[in-house]
């Protein structure tokens, strides 16, 4: 009896609605899997159309073209003699489902609809699909005529069903189902399913890989079995980067690990595993076997096909591997760089334009581009023909082969230091040195003539000329003068992005990169329509703390010594007059809180779902050794006041790489109003009452505290009622 099976899973860089490209990548993955001896190939969730189609799922065209690609795959010689598992949307009885279609030798074996839809964070699957709610039940799906003519089948099983081959049994999960409390793999495993597959569309978040790996290893540790996970990779047209991490596990151990970040459009993993190892592993777990006797059976579709070969005694089996994780700063170096590469090559632009201020944030964006150039050179050196073709198209030179990241960076990145009378020589020097060290084409200019022209128009109309606070002006004048400088820089950035290559006799235009980090966006510490307004922002979902660690990594890994000077310099916007030639404006002083505090506020607000009062209560304990209750209250109230005043800025935020679960992205991740009562009277009164009670307790005797404890408190609503005249 054959026992050893070779199975394949993959990570594909699919692109929403790119049916031709998606078809070719699926076909290539099947060819590679067959070439490695696999007899089962698993692909990512919705791989035929690309996961990120969003409201295009409502269009009949998306369903039609997906069926056409399925027909092309069924008819392709490469898909013969291997069980293929592909993801696509399907309409059954006028209901749209997110499905896996499993086929072999021009016959569709079954269609498995998704049963638990992802509907939190960036996911909106319930907007487009309906979950299959009939556990362990199937219906007959009537095939469209184009598939009937090809397969000679009229109907196929549709529902919660497993596949029985001659030698084993295979069950399917789809992405979110692995993450649910009652995952299907549990009962499937108890019912004798030995191979579980999971087609995923799982995007990158810093530190998320640990959770994904833990879920897979735990699934096979408690119940035994083989587990295959496929995932999409790359930017498929939105803010998300799908980070691969395809894997094959058995009995709690990993046997094949895919890359998390790479420029390869097609990556196929295979492993040869012994089914008897699954059976003996399960046999020793008596509690599992007792539960198995009580489980309701799954309907089975049988197929006259085996994953193993009859004479496999000399076939070597795969060995367990230790999963290699990236540190968060390495994830920042790789994830946004791969995302930028996909965005650039698919956007038909000729490179990037980045306003370089000499500070940490814009330096981090520059380092992401430089990291991208390093990845491109490495991919070309390793023989990736697709990357070579893409870079040749970008530079408009068919014979070009990139070898040096600095030289490539000079072709793809234009940086610009936009000085004003409030800029220091130190930031100018740091920006210039960084541009030299990464090799970007660098421009230095002065915005003062444009600022004076704008203010001249205002003065001509009103007869007034605003002044900075340092020169006796009001806070309104001071803020307006800062914003004029910031917005002029945005206008100039787009002008130079459109015409700088034209001025140098080169073709094309540039994408403008932004550099606002997630903490400053959360607080609104940016000017609306300044250089935070760009085409895309590679660091917009990353905290200042993580960015500093990333820049430190780049200083060491890429040998960029100027980054040490940038890290040690105080963070400043340089929008107010210098004091004796020195910077007088500091970011953390302007904000009234530190970046570390901002990160904590951000996680509590979004991840812990804390409003003002809940946040105050949590921070009382977290900060009890460094802050009094009154100080905690003031910090919380200051944060929520500024956050709510500036929330409107999030509605126009530049599309940014999603990296943190506390992102304030208003587009689809953090859906909240942008018109608040910024005084928060009820919430802040609750906080103030608690502060008063806590301060009173510290000054009371034990007897007074006991009396206070049994005293009837005054309801907060009474304190908010208008007082009698």
Curated annotation (Swiss-Prot):
CDD domains recorded: GAT_Gln-NAD-synth, NAD_synthase
Catalytic site positions: 45 (proton acceptor), 114 (for glutaminase activity), 175 (nucleophile), 357
Domain CN hydrolase: 5-275
Alphabetical UniProt keywords: ATP-binding, Ligase, NAD, Nucleotide-binding
Region entry Ligase, spans: 325-706
InterPro entries: C-N_Hydrolase (IPR003010), C-N_Hydrolase_sf (IPR036526), Gln-dep_NAD_synthase (IPR014445), NAD/GMP_synthase (IPR022310), NAD_synthase (IPR003694), Rossmann-like_a/b/a_fold (IPR014729)
Pfam families: CN_hydrolase, NAD_synthase
EC number: 6.3.5.1
Disulphide bond pairs: none
Cellular component terms per the entry's GO annotation: cytoplasm
Residues engaged in binding ATP: 355-362
GO molecular function: ATP binding; glutaminase activity; NAD+ synthase (glutamine-hydrolyzing) activity
Gene3D superfamilies for this protein: Carbon-nitrogen hydrolase, HUPs
GO biological process, one term: NAD biosynthetic process
Pathway membership, UniProt: Cofactor biosynthesis; NAD(+) biosynthesis; NAD(+) from deamido-NAD(+) (L-Gln route): step 1/1
Catalytic activity: deamido-NAD(+) + L-glutamine + ATP + H2O = L-glutamate + AMP + diphosphate + NAD(+) + H(+)
Subunit structure: Homohexamer.
Task of the protein: Catalyzes the final step of the nicotinamide adenine dinucleotide (NAD) de novo synthesis pathway, the ATP-dependent amidation of deamido-NAD using L-glutamine as a nitrogen source.
Family classification: In the C-terminal section; belongs to the NAD synthetase family.
Protein name as catalogued: Glutamine-dependent NAD(+) synthetase
Species this chain originates from: Rattus norvegicus
